[in-house]
């Protein structure tokens, strides 16, 4: 008698979180956004110029981050959005995800001199 109740409770525990609504970015073509978490949720601030690709949006966000740091800011990690994808600019590179809470995938890495490049684009030095 208890087994069906336990199974029902376990099934509800797995199904209910899957039904929760995930935060998704705007899908406006060519629009690049800086995303700022607030107490009320996420605030999407559109960057002034249209960007042709996710990589260009990431570069525009990186330039914005560097400008703010040069003006005395202290925020080293920022988030953005481009055509239904979130961008997360962190020290290792730039990650992308289709939702704020979802899994993040590496889109661009930092080269030895700090530039952003596609993973595997930089030649590896030969092993000694």
Give the label of every model feature segment.
Residues 1-8:
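Bacterial N-terminal signal peptides that target proteins for export
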